[in-house]
Design a protein with these regions (language model features):
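Short, Gly/Pro- and small/polar-rich lid/capping loops
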Residues: 2-25
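Soluble non-transmembrane domains of integral membrane proteins
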Residues: 19-280
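Cytosolic-side membrane-insertion boundary helix
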Residues: 269-311
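Alpha-helical membrane-inserting segments
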Residues: 298-301, 318, 322
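Membrane-interface amphipathic helices and adjacent TM-edge segments
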Residues: 319-337
Length: 337
């Protein structure tokens, strides 16, 4: 299903020259505030979560200086050069929006040119979802492409908000034919540090269709759900402050659809993707039924008591009541002995 290799010297990349002034647009959803730039044809330059926060936090941003150059489109030309279309994009339609139940979505259509031919990319944001739909059209470049394919990339991974705890969970993930494979990024030891000095540069290539592909830290993740991929490349490397992880999705130039999930590893949100990613959130397969039962009970209790601290205490009491008859029987048996 995949071949593994160590990173060699990068392939020569040809970049489009910047001629369009940068513009940014703000989208306010139910649980996030996103800022999108026309650079890169809709790169997300800020994505602040307003839910799943610590008491000391007013928001938590999943974008920093290492991953703001994201959602870049590229293709290989007839000379074998990688053409990265990361500049010179203009907004065709769309604008800043306050989303709501009555105004649940907004779209941004960007356009650029290569060799005088139009390329478009459209992003769709939703009020009550961390999903972003992406439609990319390079059909006009089909005859100048070497293999009639294009790549949509996320560069830089995610910030690490939990310090050394993140290192235990950092991994690239890909699902092919229902089988989820892990590409470890963080330090392996229980007390391992997420220092960039512990991360070796490495790339893995997964050939064939992927159900999803992405990267996670302890509590957050980014995942592509491609229309039909031909190749997925996951690359890890050190940066001065944290791990860098690039995700590249390559698919046929006629297939324009991709979905991006960017947000917390919340079970219900991840389950809505419909690609089986929630199985990874639940952990080992033999524990999944137990995990689901515990999750369902706690969510039900939270519906009546909107305080997870109280819910945990009540859940502990409930477990005590359920197991008390067995414990009492064991206690009587031990007294008889």
């Amino acid at each position: 299903k995949y071949s593994e290799q160590t990173i060699n010297d990068p392939v020569k990349t040809v970049l489009e020259s910047p001629v369009v002034k940068e513009q940014t647009f703000i989208i306010k959803g139910k649980n996030y505030i996103a800022e999108v730039s026309n650079v890169g044809g809709g790169s997300i330059v800020s994505y602040a979560l307003t839910k799943h926060l610590k008491k000391s936090e007013s928001s938590l941003n999943l974008i920093d200086g290492y991953n703001s150059n994201n959602l870049v489109v590229s293709f290989v030309n007839q000379s074998g050069e990688i053409i990265s279309l990361d500049k010179s994009w203009s907004l065709v339609s769309g604008g800043s929006a306050n989303l709501s139940e009555t105004n649940p979505e907004v779209s941004f259509l960007f356009t650029t040119e290569h060799l005088g031919r139009q390329v478009t990319k459209e992003l769709f944001f939703y009020f009550d979802s961390y999903e972003i739909d992406i439609s990319t059209s390079l059909r006009s470049l089909k005859d100048v492409s070497l293999d009639e394919k294009y790549t949509l990339s996320w560069v830089g991974g995610l910030p690490e908000h939990e310090g050394t705890q993140d290192a235990m969970f950092m991994e690239g993930l890909i699902s092919q034919v229902g089988n989820i494979e892990s590409f470890r990024v963080g330090a392996a030891g229980f007390f391992g540090s997420s220092s960039s000095s512990n991360i070796d540069a490495e790339e893995k290539r997964y050939v064939g269709q992927a159900d999803f592909a992405g990267y996670r830290t302890k509590y957050f993740g980014l995942f592509f759900i491609p229309q039909k991929s031909d190749l997925v490349e996951i690359t890890k490397y050190p940066t001065p402050l944290r791990a860098g992880v690039d995700i590249g999705i390559t698919q046929d130039i006629n297939l324009e659809k991709n979905k991006l999930y960017l947000g917390p590893l919340d079970y219900s949100s991840v389950e809505n993707l419909g690609v089986g990613l929630e199985e990874k959130i639940l952990g080992w397969q033999w524990l999944s039924s137990v995990s689901w039962l515990v999750y369902s009970i706690m969510i039900s209790l939270y519906g009546f008591i909107p305080n997870y601290g109280v819910v945990v205490v009540l859940f502990a009491i409930l477990i005590k009541l359920v197991t008390y008859p067995l414990m009492a029987k064991q206690l009587r048996s031990s007294k008889k002995m």
